[in-house]
Amino acid sequence: RDDVESRGLGDVYKRQFMYDAPSKSKHVNQAELDYIEQDNREAGSAPMTDEKDEKRMKFWQCFSYKQTWAFVFGKFMTDGVWWFFLFWTPSYLNTQFGIKTSDPLGMALIFTLYAVTMLSIYGGKLPTIFINRTGMNPYAARMKAMLIFAFFPLVVLLAQPLGTVSPWFPVILIGIGGAAHQSWSANIFSTVGDMFPRTAIASITGIGGMAGGVGSMILQKVAGNLFVYASGTTMIDGKEVEMTKELLEQGAQFVHPAMTFMGFEGKPAGYFVIFCVCAVAYLLGWVIMKALVPKYKPIVLE
């Protein structure tokens, strides 16, 4: 406890007496300052002002701007896809292929999934390339990049069909979808700084983060219920329960038949449906964002 308290007091001391804004710090040279503030000097960006001189946006006032709702819907529509890939992929491998993540093959597949996802580290560079080459404003550059990234998750539509050939195909395709999400995510967060004054960025980011969390919760809940429904049900000791492979092998009869979709039956059919949702979520999110904020319009508090 004493150690925690001493560290806390140390942090307070550093903040109060040692920290200074980069523009005022004697330890930051001009080259470093230019690098820190480069985003604020991009074409079309609002002029720099001292944060103390900026007017504050009240929390409820945030909801009166279309720019807020564009960010909210962009997060709501897409965050759940990322968490679905992370949370359900191990279960998918076990259900579809009988591969456990504790098996050597399962470990190799999960490692490959995350390795492919790391391609997203290049996603944040694309808007800068557009700005430098065409001189477009930051918001337009990021939206153009996000549209490109929104097409990549469409490959997830092929996860189930190609999964009949090898488990490596869906894992790689899901990894590409995950990489596209991270590239999308890096840019959608940056649109907040493009459109809102610095004093409002934390509030808008928090609102969007909550919307993403709600969207994630809904998608995971719907997916779980869909997988149970897709499996069909049987009667055990007078109770209706989910049909499993083991019960089916023991001769259990369906009370409600397994779901079929595009040639797949049972849980694989359910996964196919959710993969379709994940594949188009980014394009739908982009269309909503573009409809709400068709052109770059920074908010200026008066």
Show where each model-derived region lies:
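Single conserved hydrophobic/aromatic residue that forms the stacking wall/gate
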Residues: 2-13
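Multi-pass alpha-helical transporter architecture, strongest
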Residues: 14-18, 156-162, 267, 271-302
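Juxtamembrane intracellular "pre-TM" segments in multi-pass secondary transporters
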Residues: 21-72
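Extracytoplasmic gate region of multi-pass secondary transporters
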Residues: 63-125, 181-185, 189, 216-224
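Interfacial helix-cap and linker-helix signal at transmembrane-aqueous boundaries
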Residues: 93-94, 126-127, 131, 222-232, ...
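Loop-to-transmembrane helix entry
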Residues: 98-116, 141-142, 168-172, 203-206, ...
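A late C-terminal transmembrane helix in Major Facilitator Superfamily
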Residues: 120-121, 193-232
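C-terminal transmembrane helical hairpin of 12-TM major facilitator-type secondary transporters
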Residues: 139-187
